[in-house]
Each structure stands twice: as C-alpha cells, then as structure tokens.
UniProtKB/Swiss-Prot annotation:
GO terms for cellular component: Ndc80 complex; nucleus. It comes from Yarrowia lipolytica (strain CLIB 122 / E 150) (Yeast). It is found in: Nucleus; Chromosome, Centromere, Kinetochore. Acts as a component of the essential kinetochore-associated NDC80 complex, which is required for chromosome segregation and spindle checkpoint activity. Belongs to the SPC24 family. This is Probable kinetochore protein SPC24. InterPro entries: Ndc80_Spc24, Spc24_Fungi_globular_sf. The keyword Membrane does not apply. Residues 36-119 form a coiled coil. The keyword Ribonucleoprotein does not apply.
C-alpha cells in the first residue's frame, strides 16, 4: 500500500470535530457567564446607587436631628452595605476579566487546532522520513518509546484506549524477535 494512501486513511480516522465542538461549547458558556455577570454587576451598581441615595437622605435628616441614634445606626448599616456591594462589584469584575482571558486562550487553542487539521498530508510525507512517520503513527496509537541513548530505544510503553492500562516492554531482551514485539504491542492495544 502506498504510504500516502495509508496516511490519508489514518488521517481520516482522526477527527478534531469533537475538540472544536467542545471548545465552541465552552466559548458559548463563557459568553453566557460573562453576560450573566455583567447583569449582576449592573444590578449591584444599581443597588449601590440606591444605598448611596438612602444614605445621603439619612445623613441630611440626621444633620437636622443629631440626637437620634437609630438614624446613625441606619447610616452605619448603609455604609457597611455599600462596602459589601463595592467588594462584590470588584469580585465580579475580577471574575469577568479571568473569564475573558480564558475565552481568549480557548480561541487561540481553537485556531491552532483548526490550523493543524488543515495541514496537508502530502507535505508531511515529503518533509518527514519514514522512521519519523512511523514514530508519529505509533504515538497516535498510544505507543511511546523511551531511550537511554538517543540512537537506541530501550523500553516501549503501550497505552490501551479500551482498558486505560499502560503496559511496558523491555526492548533490551535479546530473546524477543521483531515478530514477538509486534504481536505484543498489537495485543496490548
């Protein structure tokens, strides 16, 4: 079979649509959360303005009658409420900023995924050696190699997608044939 056809078949089996859909769902949720928080922020500001008006009215009335301790206590309560609302507004603004930063990051990741999914297979075949292509194919299947020396692989780790287990195979054992190693890897996948 032609390597280009093989790579096309392998590429067709991989889909980024789920990741893109997930990212879009997260983006919609973040937008919805931002709108909700903006509404809460506007509501909190309106409450704060009402509290400030009430406080000002109370202060005016207290100025005329400074002997009333109830009014003074009410003014203090309004001041505490004003401070609590101001803190809530600050917290909402911080959360909104963090949400916007997360949205920007997710959009950048979405663009990267879209760019990667649009790269032609032919350029990968032309630019990579057959050994590099084999290693990429193994990695996509869940097989990685660990080397003590860069030129020689000493251990193979196989991650099974069906059982979520990781099996290791020592490649330094001389009794293992290429046939045995290949069968072992495929059995573990």
């Amino acid at each position: 079979m032609d390597p280009i056809d093989l790579l096309r078949d392998v590429a067709k089996s991989f889909s980024t649509n789920e990741e893109i859909a997930s990212t879009e769902r997260v983006s919609v949720d973040i937008t919805r959360l931002s709108l909700f928080r903006e509404a809460k922020l506007a509501e909190a500001r309106d409450k704060l303005q009402d509290q400030i008006r009430q406080r000002d009215l109370c202060q005016e009335s207290v100025a005329g009658d400074s002997t009333t301790s109830e009014r003074t206590q009410h003014v203090h309560e309004l001041e505490r409420e004003k401070m609590r609302l101001a803190r809530a507004i600050n917290d909402l603004e911080e959360t909104l900023n963090a949400t916007q930063a997360a949205t920007s990051k997710l959009n950048a990741e979405l663009e990267l995924v879209e760019k990667e999914s649009q790269q032609p297979i032919e350029s990968a075949v032309e630019n990579d050696s057959s050994a590099a292509l084999q290693l990429k194919l193994f990695r996509t299947l869940g097989v990685t190699f660990d080397a003590e020396k860069p030129e020689k692989y000493t251990k193979c780790m196989i991650r099974s997608n069906t059982t979520s287990n990781v099996a290791t195979l020592d490649l330094n054992v001389k009794e293992y044939s290429g046939f045995f190693i290949t069968n072992y890897i495929w059995d573990k996948l």
